[in-house]
């Protein structure tokens, strides 16, 4: 069976996108891992699947799978690519698109300049909602890894995030420490780990180790998490430019109880077919 797909990326965070509205495709975790391989497959950070909506008030259901085959509840960069894909493929002609994920709902808006803004979920700080093991909600937690003890913030953006403030992202041990913290026992579902360098209240540099993957060139939900944690720690303003290895995102947050707005580009690379 031949399956049509698109290869896309958001600031270098790359995706294989499947239309499951006009196709009927199921990929096992083993198949996803096979196709994610950059030497023997297509190569991608995550698989995005477009499905018909489960709610008549929504336009689509949005599913996300990591390169290891595990399903996750959120991907901000993927959401921008999702919006561009459904417009490009004629699945939707709206500028404002409403979708559900396994953990909530999102609004996607295609802007006049071609960028796409995503209304992300309201950040969740309560430990059991992240999930994170702690007796109470705090702005900063102490995490002890095998190599060192770090101070971090914890939040859910529809997926769990750990944010560590560093003096320099260039010198941060993203690969080793990021992997340790990602699978730390206090994150029962693992976590994405962001290393944040604060340049000014309106500008940060960020590198992210994604759970189930590794360091990526960009992470939209990670950018949102970093800004939210920085704001709650009274280090950042409401509107922040986030510089990632793959490019820049604009993040805006009004504070607790409000959703986070993220704006940035989405790029179509090529279309292809895979045999399953």
Swiss-Prot record:
Binding locations of substrate: 13, 46, 66, 76-77, 159, 192, 210-211, 220-221
EC numbers, comma separated: 5.1.1.7
Show the Pfam families listed in the entry.
DAP_epimerase
Question: Per the record, what are the reactions this protein catalyses?
Answer: (2S,6S)-2,6-diaminopimelate = meso-2,6-diaminopimelate
Please give one Gene Ontology molecular function term for this protein: diaminopimelate epimerase activity
Give an example GO cellular component term for this record: cytosol
EC top class, in one word? Answer: isomerase
Q: Does the keyword Amino-acid biosynthesis apply?
A: yes
Give the positions the UniProt entry annotates as the active site.
Answer: 75, 219
From the UniProt record, give the pathway where this protein acts: Amino-acid biosynthesis; L-lysine biosynthesis via DAP pathway; DL-2,6-diaminopimelate from LL-2,6-diaminopimelate: step 1/1
Residue numbers for the site described as Could be important to modulate the pK values of the two catalytic cysteine residues?
161, 210
Entry's transmembrane regions = none
Q: Which PANTHER family match?
A: DIAMINOPIMELATE EPIMERASE, DIAMINOPIMELATE EPIMERASE, CHLOROPLASTIC
Q: How does it assemble?
A: Homodimer.
For this protein, the record's NCBIfam families field holds:
DapF (TIGR00652)
Full protein name: Diaminopimelate epimerase
Q: What is the lineage of its organism?
A: Bacteria, Pseudomonadati, Pseudomonadota, Gammaproteobacteria, Alteromonadales
């Amino acid at each position: 069976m031949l399956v049509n797909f698109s290869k896309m990326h958001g600031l270098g965070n790359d995706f294989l996108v499947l239309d499951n509205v006009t196709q009927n495709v199921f990929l096992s975790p083993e198949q996803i891992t096979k196709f994610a391989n950059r030497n023997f497959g297509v190569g991608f950070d995550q698989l995005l699947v477009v499905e018909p909506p489960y709610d008549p008030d929504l336009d689509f259901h949005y599913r996300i799978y990591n390169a290891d085959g595990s399903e996750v509840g959120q991907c901000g960069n993927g959401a921008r690519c999702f919006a561009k894909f459904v417009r490009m493929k004629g699945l939707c002609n709206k500028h404002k698109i409403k979708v559900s994920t396994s953990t909530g709902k999102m609004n996607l808006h295609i802007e006049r300049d071609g960028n796409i803004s995503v209304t992300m979920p309201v950040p969740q700080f309560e430990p059991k909602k992240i999930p994170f093991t702690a007796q109470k909600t705090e702005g900063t937690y102490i995490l002890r890894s095998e190599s060192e003890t770090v101070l971090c913030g914890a939040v859910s953006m529809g997926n769990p995030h750990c944010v560590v403030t560093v003096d320099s992202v260039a010198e941060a041990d993203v690969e080793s420490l990021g992997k340790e913290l990602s699978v730390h026992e206090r994150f029962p579902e693992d976590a994405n780990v962001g290393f944040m360098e604060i340049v000014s209240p309106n500008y940060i540099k960020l590198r992210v180790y994604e759970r189930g993957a590794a360091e990526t060139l960009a992470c939209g939900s990670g950018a949102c998490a970093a800004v939210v944690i920085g704001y709650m720690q009274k280090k950042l303003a409401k509107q922040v430019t986030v510089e990632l290895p793959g490019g820049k995102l604009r993040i805006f947050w009004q504070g607790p109880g409000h959703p986070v707005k993220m704006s940035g580009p989405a790029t179509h690379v090529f279309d292809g077919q895979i045999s399953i």
